[in-house]
Amino acid sequence: MPYQSPITFQEPQLTVESLKQQLESFTEYQKQEFFDHHPVTDLVLGRSEYMDLLLHRLWQFFGFDELVEVSLVAVGGYGRGELHPLSDIDLLVLSQQPLSEQVANKISQFLTLLWDLKLEIGHAVRTVEQCAEIGKADLTVATNLQEARLLCGCEETFHRLKMVIHSESFWPSEIFYQAKVREQKERHARYHDTTYNLEPDIKSTPGGLRDIHTLSWVARRHFGATSLYEMSRFGFLTDAEYRELVECQDFLWRVRFALHIELKRYDNRLTFAHQVQVARHLGYFGEGNRGIEMMMKEFFRTLRRVAELNKMLLKIFDKAILNNGEEAEAVIIDDDFQRRGNMIEARKPALFQARPETILDMFLHMASDSTIESVAPATMRQLRTARRRLNKFLHTLPAAREKFIELVRHPNALHKAFSQMHKLGVLAAYLPQWNQIVGQMQFDLFHVYTVDEHSIRLLKHIHLFSDANNHDRHPICCEIYPKIQKKELLILAAIFHDIGKGRGGDHSEIGADEAFDFCIEHGLSKPEAKLVAWLVKNHLLMSVTAQRRDIYDPDVIIEFAKKVRDEERLEYLVCLTVADICATNPELWNSWKRTLLAELFYSTQRALRRGLENPVDVRERIRHNQQMASALLRKEGFSSREIEVLWQRFKADYFLRHTHKQIAWHCTHLLRHEDSSKPLVLLSKKATRGGTEVFIYTKDQAALFATVVAELDRRNLNVHDAQIMASKDGYVLDTFMVLDQNGQAIEEDRHQALIRHLVHVLEDGRPTTQKARRIPRNLQHFKVKTQVDFLPTKSKKRTLMEFVALDTPGLLATVGATFAELNLDLHAAKITTIGERAEDLFILTNAQGTRLNEEEEQHLREKLIEHVAELAPSAQ
């Protein structure tokens, strides 16, 4: 036996060092037992029993067993008899009278020894009367005392405490129940009321261990049930529900035990770093991040099950505790359903098993009746039972298919039905593909939610487009969506857009094929099915084009318009795209992205209306911009001759890639800029295209792009777009679109300081060198292979390079410095950050002003990979 029972410890063994060794030996033993797949329940309870014996032996050693009316009591989780390797050990030293100074000093020595053993001790020294007084005023103390368990000492003193705790005046069960429900709501709100968080807390996240504890606390206070098993004996849990809760608790315990093995100090957060190790400890393996994603999928599914049971059982408790079993009067809806208060309930005990399609009727009623807010607990229980006994998915039933399409077409279903259908497992029971994505996560910083939660949020965002109050945030979608005749096609595309994830291959292709089959199976016409399938297949097309292509290039617009083909598709696609971005990550949507998508939408709309066979005449566009800008400049008092002399220095590209207002703004300051040897730096006072435009005019110099972006990076500013242009006489006319750390335009009170800093580094004239910097904690555990690809382009003069890497500090400046090192000219850049990944696009030429040859491309690829590795060695 690798460790000794503490009860047999002799006095020479009761030293700090000896006890530390014993504890370490026991912990190592349990660790090995865990790796040998020993039941985690035995380990958790066994650790508590070991601690009981140790404390009992030390209590004896200090001579406390001779004290009268003093007890050592376990409270909280330890009181339940549950200890994980790093759990707090909550102790109460209980007495009938205040302790004498001598005894108090001895108790202090006892506690000091426990701390010296590096045990996480939480303690209180109180009389029974003090416990009663503090417990009445503090819900947390009252809850901990409920789970009090005598370890050693005076039984009579402990009995007096139990009498106080169990008295109705201590915490009346109705008040205790309401307080615990309120506490749970507040806790859930801290986690955004979702079971899906990137780095979840095993205890406190919705559906976590605390939700199981809440059920136990309420049942113990009102019904006297001291365990989940006793709750089933009292009839508040069915045998199946009891087994399910125990199974969920067991899984969460295994995750927590594995986490505590990995940690050195107490924590219940499953951070990215620890997800990697916990997945290995639990036996989840796979290529890349597959093992982590499999483990987290089971974790999130477990949270969903606990959350569902918690919600149902609290409703049952609500009726039993607050209403004394009394019910509101039933209002008949039809033969199958009735409304009682704000809840819908089935009128027949086996309705869903006899006619499963009526499950969908229930949600149709919820969509149609604004007074119905939720499902009655008995009906939830019936639904759970029927769901488990289904021998085939609901979509195979013709009657269910009719009702599902009716739901999709219902104007209130988006906000009244689909979220509830998901929470109650009905979407998973309807569609096998949906069942596969429940709990499916992606191990990255970009996708904040699991695939199913993201899809439900996408539906909610589509609903927001019907509300005129959201026009400022979503101007295009709020104008388009109300006019869309067949909104059900957009909703079906939303349901299927990510449904192919987690199965290997292109999820857009997989989802498109399955969406088409689903539409045909559900009686939609072939053209309708084709439109839904096209939307699913191309749901990323618009965001990728807007964020990673040069949308001011007429060829890019024509290429995009050819893929879209008509305005109807464009309108559906922009609504799906905006909702998709908003539902992926709350921080993704900002005025910059809104402006990009708007420009792409309107440019494409104009191209489609003009006809794809009639592309924009570049010379006509340049002429138009010059005429409009010239008119604005003449209003400022400049002569046509002054304007003409300045413009003769510019290449045609300048007038093509800027609006007439930008041209007028630049040139107003250039014509007033007296000393051309000094740099001119301008910042737009109003948000331009959703960000701040930084315009730089200066003599061309080596590594200018790298110098500018390094300085912007130092000021915590992010470059999202860059137009790099040279005049005919050796000056640069560079434009950077910049956002602050919050994705907003730079505040005006920062403008002058930023201008001074940029002028200083430009006058200094020396390329800025980037030193390796510490990778932020949230990036340290991600591996992103640096990729450099050269994309096909119609241009015979320029190279289009796509660059992917871990988004480490100084990355963009390092890329710019590499271009300068190889004597390459940068003409444009599109900078996109997707979670931990930088996915950037650069337009380049070589020293001769032509596109790179294969040898130059390979040299550039090697240098970029080398320099990025130096910047972030652990990222590769």
UniProtKB/Swiss-Prot annotation:
Q: Does the keyword Flavoprotein apply?
A: no
Q: Which domain of life is it from?
A: Bacteria
Which Pfam family is an annotated match for this chain, by its short name? HD
The entry's keywords: Hydrolase, Magnesium, Multifunctional enzyme, Nucleotidyltransferase, Repeat, Transferase
Regulation of protein activity = Uridylyltransferase (UTase) activity is inhibited by glutamine, while glutamine activates uridylyl-removing (UR) activity.
Using the UniProt annotation, give all residue ranges assigned to the region (Uridylyltransferase): 1-332
Query: Record's SMART domains?
Result: HDc
Uridylyl-removing, as annotated region: 333-692
Q: Which residues form the HD domain?
A: 451-573
Query: PROSITE patterns from the entry?
Result: ACT (PS51671), HD (PS51831)
Record GO biological process:
regulation of nitrogen utilization
Q: Which PANTHER family match?
A: BIFUNCTIONAL URIDYLYLTRANSFERASE/URIDYLYL-REMOVING ENZYME (PTHR47320), BIFUNCTIONAL URIDYLYLTRANSFERASE_URIDYLYL-REMOVING ENZYME (PTHR47320:SF1)
Q: Which HAMAP family match?
A: PII_uridylyl_transf (MF_00277)
Describe the function of this protein: Modifies, by uridylylation and deuridylylation, the PII regulatory proteins (GlnB and homologs), in response to the nitrogen status of the cell that GlnD senses through the glutamine level. Under low glutamine levels, catalyzes the conversion of the PII proteins and UTP to PII-UMP and PPi, while under higher glutamine levels, GlnD hydrolyzes PII-UMP to PII and UMP (deuridylylation). Thus, controls uridylylation state and activity of the PII proteins, and plays an important role in the regulation of nitrogen assimilation and metabolism.
Task: Write down what this protein is called.
Answer: Bifunctional uridylyltransferase/uridylyl-removing enzyme
The organism is Vibrio cholerae serotype O1 (strain ATCC 39315 / El Tor Inaba N16961)
Upper lineage ranks?
Answer: Bacteria, Pseudomonadati, Pseudomonadota, Gammaproteobacteria, Vibrionales
